Amino acid sequence: WKDSGMPLVVIVHGLSGCSSSQYVVGLQKALELRGWASVAMNCRGATGEANDLPRAYHAGAHDDLAQVMTLVAERYAGVPLSLVGYSLGGAMTLNYLATMPLPAHLFAATAVSVPLDLASCADRLDQGLSQIYRKHLLDNLMKAWQRKVLKLHSLGLEADAERIEHLLALGPFNSFRAFDDAVVAPLHGFHSAEDYYARCSPLQNLARIHCPTMIIQAADDPFLTPKCFPEASTLSSSLYLDVSPQGGHVGFVAAGEHWREPTYFLEQRIPQFLDSQVPESVRRAEMVKRLPPAYQSSLA
């Protein structure tokens, strides 16, 4: 990061992702080409190192995101900020935008491949080819919680470790709803999976978002249901819904000049939208920066 006055983008990965995920790194490279800086948030346990508490990240964990945004806003005071979230990170992003105090310099956000209605999306993963994704994600989640159990034991936090062991033993889990009901809900203060879905689905909060925000969805996303493509009347005037006929889940791959070098629609669309929302003062600073030094002092 160089204090150039250019925007800084905070990026939140999806379920089973991390700051090293291809879609995160790809966006960071695209932003760097524009002279923008970026920060990638790693949610609890995302790097493979379990955190010290009997909790993880979920659609309603926007308190963690709020802490990161506050830290970034304080560390880079006055710098224009924007926010991008993918999949579950997109759900966290939208819930954060709707329910939390926002930094004064946050000017725009984007959420991609978002399960806006958690209940129907959980059931969607029990159908057809989507079950392949469900098995992969549930296997990763079980491994993450098992690592957490070992970490808690190593710290002498036996009560927490044993509680999680007891919940995991209720498996095997053959659906997200069963896993969320047995593990996620009780460990994060929800009465049940239904309670978690009802309280943390971003769909109910969209009308409360006032920061300019684009939601990018693909019509062929195997994770999403019709409820994830809301009518314009349910959106606030600050929300924009961009639906692509193809793109899958966080994929959005387009043919490149060579078949081994595909291009990614999101690496073009996200910076394009964020750039369209940049404050005029930042645009002026960027223009001045591109001028020869002799002209910069007179125009800055």
Where are these regions (language model features)?
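Catalytic active-site module of serine/aspartate enzymes centered on a nucleophile-bearing elbow/loop
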Residues: 247, 251-300
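Alpha/beta-hydrolase-fold enzymes
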Residues: 76-187
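Short beta-strand-to-loop junctions in surface cap/lid or active-site-entrance loops
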Residues: 1-5
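Conserved alpha/beta-hydrolase
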Residues: 17-20, 28-52
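Short beta-strand element of the alpha/beta-hydrolase
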Residues: 6-14
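Catalytic histidine neighborhood in serine/cysteine hydrolases
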Residues: 235-252
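Short beta-strand/loop motif that positions the catalytic acidic residue
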Residues: 209, 215-217
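Catalytic nucleophile-loop/oxyanion-hole region of alpha/beta-hydrolase
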Residues: 44-82
